[in-house]
């Protein structure tokens, strides 16, 4: 259904566009086309005048004037060129005549001179002496020097000669440095040495900047407890002369925290042989000094952890720490602390057996027996050679009629020895022969402890003997009869 129309007219919002244009610009009118064309022509002429265009009459006058001026200039140039030609012609004829006369006179004079000198000898040309500047001569000798490097055959100074000259110069510098080394070592002896194994009078030869930098690092390490280590300290293991550099940092005054971090750093980055040097020169000395200087003769916790970390390389620990500690005469306190570290850390069986064989051959001492007991208590499957060494070690303390075993027969044996003997009987009673068992029972009877001796005897009797196998018989078992 359509919408109903409204009678009310809507009010417009604004006037129509046509009314707005009329109000702003006036009434719109039609423009005549002729007037529009005239206006365009006028505008075009005005634009031409502004751009500098001229009409045809003016341009013809300008071209005529330019042509007249050009003709006048060409006429003047032509007249001048003709005058020059006439002058040159007169000059050349005069000069040719004069030159002919001069040549005749010179020939006559030269002939007279030759006739005058003919009786006396040949004619010699006089040499001209030229003075050379000193700077030019020095520069010439620098590039073309006459010496051993100068190739006299070819008369040149080539690249090979320069290379040989530089090689000889380098060799001379090396010889000079070798001559100066004794003097440098004498100057460095005043810096002292650490008790880490440097011989008396031995010093380090390092650049002054390096010594200054690592002296500053050493002053930082005195009070270092946590955080990151200086980068200069971390790069020491990668240096070839790390022992000289670490000596400058004064390891005796490192804090215990630094000893632990340094042990981890050096043992993990150096080879076993180089790690042995670090453990022996620094860690062992700090271990002994700390126990000796402490009031209760205990070891600092961080140094204890450092000793534990040094077992990361067992061969370096045994050769650089344990063996020197025993050989230099450690006390039972030091052996007990070091042994507790050894008891807590797993050691490869081969390293353990080799260390045990080495300790069994040393003269008797209670600290050595402490380490023997700890290694036996690890329950490793020892080689028969090491087991035999253990048997001979305990057998040598029995009393012999001829007294061939010396002081070992009369020595008062400590309790730790009996404990080590009991440990061996418990762990390896099935790895000994019957003859060895009899000798050990005799030792227990003569030198046995009142409480520990019966236990050792019971363990030895409970074990089974190791059967001795002849190598030839073992090979016979593997033979096959092919007939």
From Swiss-Prot:
Keywords: Cytoplasm, Nucleus, Phosphoprotein, Ribosome biogenesis. Pfam families: Bystin. Residues 1-21, 33-55, 67-123, 171-200 are annotated as: Disordered. It is found in: Cytoplasm; Nucleus, Nucleolus. Present with 21600 molecules/cell in log phase SD medium. It comes from Saccharomyces cerevisiae (strain ATCC 204508 / S288c) (Baker's yeast). One of its GO terms (cellular component) is nucleus. Belongs to the bystin family. Disulfide bonds: none annotated. GO terms for biological process: endonucleolytic cleavage in ITS1 to separate SSU-rRNA from 5.8S rRNA and LSU-rRNA from tricistronic rRNA transcript (SSU-rRNA, 5.8S rRNA, LSU-rRNA); maturation of SSU-rRNA; poly(A)+ mRNA export from nucleus; rRNA processing. Required for normal export of the pre-40S particles from the nucleus to the cytoplasm. Its subcellular location and association with pre-40S subunit shifts from mixed cytoplasm/nucleus to all nuclear in RPS19 disruptions, suggesting it acts after the ribosomal protein. Residues 185-198 have a biased composition (Polar residues). This is Essential nuclear protein 1. GO terms for molecular function: snoRNA binding. The lineage of its organism: Eukaryota, Fungi, Dikarya, Ascomycota, Saccharomycotina. It comes from the Eukaryota. Its main location: cytoplasm. The keyword Phosphoprotein applies. The modification Phosphoserine is found at residues 172, 190, 404. InterPro entries: Bystin (IPR007955). Residues 96-123, 174-183 have a biased composition (Acidic residues).
């Amino acid at each position: 259904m359509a919408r109903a129309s409204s009678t009310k007219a809507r009010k417009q919002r604004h006037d129509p566009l046509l009314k707005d244009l009329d109000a702003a610009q006036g009434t719109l009118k039609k423009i005549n086309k002729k007037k529009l064309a005239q206006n365009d022509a006028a505008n075009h002429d005005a634009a031409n005048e502004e751009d500098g265009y001229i009409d045809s009459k003016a341009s013809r006058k300008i071209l005529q004037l330019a042509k007249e001026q050009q003709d006048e200039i060409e006429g003047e140039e032509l007249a001048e060129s003709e005058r020059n030609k006439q002058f040159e012609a007169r000059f050349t004829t005069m000069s040719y005549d004069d030159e002919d006369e001069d040549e005749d006179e010179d020939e006559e004079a030269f002939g007279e001179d030759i006739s005058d000198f003919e009786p006396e000898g040949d004619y010699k040309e006089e040499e001209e002496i030229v003075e050379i500047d000193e700077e030019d001569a020095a520069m010439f000798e620098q590039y073309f020097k006459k010496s051993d490097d100068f190739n006299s055959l070819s008369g040149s100074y080539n690249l090979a000669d320069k290379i040989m000259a530089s090689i000889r110069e380098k060799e001379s510098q090396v010889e000079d440095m070798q001559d100066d080394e004794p003097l440098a070592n004498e100057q460095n002896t005043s810096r002292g040495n650490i008790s880490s194994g440097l011989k008396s009078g031995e010093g380090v030869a390092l650049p002054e900047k390096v010594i200054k930098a690592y002296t500053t690092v050493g002053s930082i390490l005195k009070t270092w407890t946590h955080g990151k280590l200086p980068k200069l300290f971390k790069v020491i293991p990668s240096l070839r002369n790390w022992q000289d550099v670490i000596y400058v940092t004064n390891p005796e005054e490192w804090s215990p925290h630094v000893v632990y971090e340094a042990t981890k750093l050096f043992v993990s980055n150096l080879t076993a042989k180089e790690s042995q040097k670090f453990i022996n020169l620094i860690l062992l000395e700090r271990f002994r000094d700390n126990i000796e200087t402490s009031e209760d003769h205990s070891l600092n916790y961080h140094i204890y952890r450092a000793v534990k970390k040094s077992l990361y390389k067992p061969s370096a620990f045994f050769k650089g720490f344990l063996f020197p500690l025993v050989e230099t005469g450690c006390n039972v306190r030091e052996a007990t602390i070091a042994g507790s570290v050894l008891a807590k850390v797993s050691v490869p069986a081969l390293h353990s057996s080799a260390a045990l064989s080495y300790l069994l051959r040393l003269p008797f001492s209670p600290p050595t027996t402490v380490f023997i007991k700890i290694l036996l208590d690890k329950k490793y499957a020892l080689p028969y050679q090491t087991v035999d060494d253990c048997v001979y070690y305990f057998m040598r303390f029995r009393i012999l009629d001829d007294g061939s075993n010396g002081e070992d027969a009369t020595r008062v044996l400590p309790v730790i020895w009996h404990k080590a003997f009991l440990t061996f009987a418990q762990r390896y009673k099935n790895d000994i022969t019957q003859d060895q068992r009899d000798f050990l029972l005799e030792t227990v009877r003569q030198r046995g402890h009142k409480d520990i001796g019966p236990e050792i005897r019971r363990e030895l009797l409970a074990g089974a003997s190791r059967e001795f196998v002849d190598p030839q018989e073992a090979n016979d078992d593997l033979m096959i009869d092919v007939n």
